[in-house]
Amino acid sequence: MSQSTATYINVIGAGLAGSEAAYQIAKRGIPVKLYEMRGVKATPQHKTTNFAELVCSNSFRGDSLTNAVGLLKEEMRRLDSIIMRNGEANRVPAGGAMAVDREGYAKSVTAELENHPLIEVIRDEITEIPNDAITVIATGPLTSDALAEKIHAVNGGDGFYFYDAAAPIIDKSTIDMSKVYLKSRYDKGEAAYLNCPMTKEEFMAFHEALTTAEEAPLNSFEKEKYFEGCMPIEVMAKRGIKTMLYGPMKPVGLEYPDDYTGPRDGEFKTPYAVVQLRQDNAAGSLYNIVGFQTHLKWGEQKRVFQMIPGLENAEFVRYGVMHRNSYMDSPNLLTETFQSRSNPNLFFAGQMTGVEGYVESAASGLVAGINAARLFKREEALIFPQTTAIGSLPHYVTHADSKHFQPMNVNFGIIKELEGPRIRDKKERYEAIASRALADLDTCLALL
């Protein structure tokens, strides 16, 4: 297939990946037609018509370079990511993590793209894959059925899916502050989380209620299949009575404050279990229940989650919801630049490619956008080295075992190992990986 001679590039979908791709293309002096159907047609999960809306959590996760996602974010900052830049401008306290005021952040991304002189925003649903120009498809895990059929047809591959869930958000003014305390795990960073401690008796009663609560129904033809990073809390609870104690209710590093007077198990300094609440907006009036993605019926959510100490009278401004997410057989269908193997004028980006997470989705849009622009200019594709986070992620999703392919978060396990003797200290090893990654990325920057 010959390269398109159009004078612009299409980007379909203005989520995190599409927004990033559109910006990276326009930054390189190429006109962009950015299509977004929200405003014309709603999705089951989005609440606004803003671009790059965050629907599951307001957290971009850890910020340290000894954390793989922290490294990925730093690489993206150096590549002038619109998502990272606007995220930084709308940060809210979150200890050692990066969390944002989701409304302020999405509005600022939207405004920047809508006001860009080279970006034409078109509010319309796309049901056919355009063949008039180089196109980046970033319609996300909630891709409409009509377009999903065309994507499957053009790729000649089967679609996959998994379920994704969002946590409830509560009104801070309805939290009983006498029963909770402010602290970040291990006192890392500023004290940014409200902690709801549980005794063993309280936890056992909560576990019983959670595992017997009624879930919202699924379509009978859909087999449940969850991505581990966004698993419903009730599914986790059913895996074992202590599973949550090693997950979102882990008490380690969240000791009682000296002035705590509530119930506790004997003289223990650490609660048996802890539910954490994280600030969800800049005003600090909303908090989400960390790790409590759920598919329980709304009435059951209210009944069960009000058993959490401090939330007995909590007001839920949004209940948890679950939706089906689609993703592609990327190992067979895409190259490391997220370019279609069967149609070189077509790129894909975002969670539909099998990257998992906000930051990872934006990173895939960055890679696809840069390479769509390079194709437009008839320049050689830019493949970031596997020593970097932004290079290792697309390499993983396009080289994984297709038969067992599952969505993947960025992690140090997929980054190329260091040469020489293994550094035994994990922190030092990760620091060395990060140092090498940023040095190698700086070499790539010279090509841009």
UniProtKB/Swiss-Prot annotation:
Protein's GO biological process: tRNA methylation; tRNA wobble uridine modification
Cofactor: FAD
Keywords (A to Z) from UniProt: Cytoplasm, FAD, Flavoprotein, Methyltransferase, NAD, NADP, Transferase, tRNA processing
InterPro entries named among the record's database cross-references: FAD/NAD-bd_sf, MnmG-rel, MnmG-rel_CS, MnmG_N, TrmFO
Gene3D superfamilies assigned to the protein according to its UniProt record, in alphabetical order: FAD/NAD(P)-binding domain (3.50.50.60)
Binding locations of FAD: G13, A14, G15, L16, A17, G18
Protein name: Methylenetetrahydrofolate--tRNA-(uracil-5-)-methyltransferase TrmFO
Gene behind this protein: trmFO
